[in-house]
């Protein structure tokens, strides 16, 4: 491709709305264009990368024995109503009615549709196991789209679904997809970690995420270097710190009510009482669907809303507003406590280990000290509802865990019979008995994977694409397009590389060399061959994007090196 014929435009300035490297570079390099909040169009250069990621995914899915199809993105409400997820998705689902008033949605995910399709075709155990997949656009009305295609309202996913006779069969299908995902992300050149995860609205039992460590990731990963345990913070188990073993120290003291005027926050309480945050228990008031509940964690801990939501089984969970807090507790925000509270109370495991702690008194300007669980109040649930943090004990081996941010690029689930039972997707076993199919679900975000690659492969000059998904492998840059000797050699190199099957650009624009070099670096072409003043000698400059130095070598050697580099890059 000649650059003079390409439909693209690079930007020198960083767009104001772009906060992270991948978003900035995808806009600056002319890979995509914003249409609206969370909605983007891919331009030719970006779409070439996009298609290559799709192709790698497709090749590995086919290699694992999965069969590709394509489902509609416009889906009838009845399918989601049958599984109960029409309500579960809440405001995140794009809903619409046709001219006859029938409810539809733009598909946020396709479990129900795949299940119904298999149900209509497959009836015998002889047809199982079965793995189907599609690469299709999804729609979710994100509350706050951000970071470009990292969290958008329209995105492309590869979603696959396995159907098996039993749990043993599901284990085999799950392992096939697990291995396929490892090969996919290896070929994309990603440095990733596999973590245990929450199943969320998808339902089911076991779940794992493929995470790319990144400071701009929206997920937090807890992992143990000692034993290999890894989970996202929604799933990571928290080991409660025990109260001290000194029975005299931990004996129950008498409950005291203390005046604490204008003392609301943990920091203010620490100063007032002269003790650490570990001696306080926060009482947080939440709205869980149509109920109000209280949740308690230690003063130095953060509540994990996903764990709380899963425990309560609610669709919507949000912090109560000040009016609700005052109505339920009889006090202003900052003075809520469990004693005398006439709502369900959920206590974190760590709070259950505490003795003689401080809580709000449900009276503005007052707190209780020497509070003890069961004596002074009785919780409905005692469960792990806090968020793990750096240095906490690993739930498997007890060593300190590390916590980092990550980008989720893939997610695999064991769904079991959640959808097959709800949608009556059954098969006849060897004895003629009806049994529900055992399902698995496997997703990869194509857009997000593209952004994740950029997050891990960039520098101050632009993107550094792995050869496997680069829009073009090589760019040939003649320094002076009016010099016939330079242009003749550049054309020769361009032609020979193209005949070898190498994807090559020829920057034949009448631009300054500096502009061409900056564009090549910004776009991230892996190999640059510059044809300059020594063209008459057959000498060119050969440079890899990931390296700073270049080599002045004969053009034949440059062609051979490019061929070898591309072959090795595509082999990985």
From Swiss-Prot:
The gene is proS. NCBIfam families: PRK09194.1, proS_fam_II. It comes from the Bacteria. Keywords: Aminoacyl-tRNA synthetase, ATP-binding, Cytoplasm, Ligase, Nucleotide-binding, Protein biosynthesis. Its main location: cytoplasm. It is an enzyme of class 6 (ligase). This is Proline--tRNA ligase. It is found in: Cytoplasm. One of its GO terms (biological process) is prolyl-tRNA aminoacylation. GO terms for cellular component: cytosol. Belongs to the class-II aminoacyl-tRNA synthetase family. ProS type 1 subfamily. GO terms for molecular function: aminoacyl-tRNA deacylase activity; ATP binding; catalytic activity, acting on a protein; proline-tRNA ligase activity; transferase activity. It catalyses: tRNA(Pro) + L-proline + ATP = L-prolyl-tRNA(Pro) + AMP + diphosphate. Consists of three domains: the N-terminal catalytic domain, the editing domain and the C-terminal anticodon-binding domain. Homodimer. Catalyzes the attachment of proline to tRNA(Pro) in a two-step reaction: proline is first activated by ATP to form Pro-AMP and then transferred to the acceptor end of tRNA(Pro). As ProRS can inadvertently accommodate and process non-cognate amino acids such as alanine and cysteine, to avoid such errors it has two additional distinct editing activities against alanine. One activity is designated as 'pretransfer' editing and involves the tRNA(Pro)-independent hydrolysis of activated Ala-AMP.
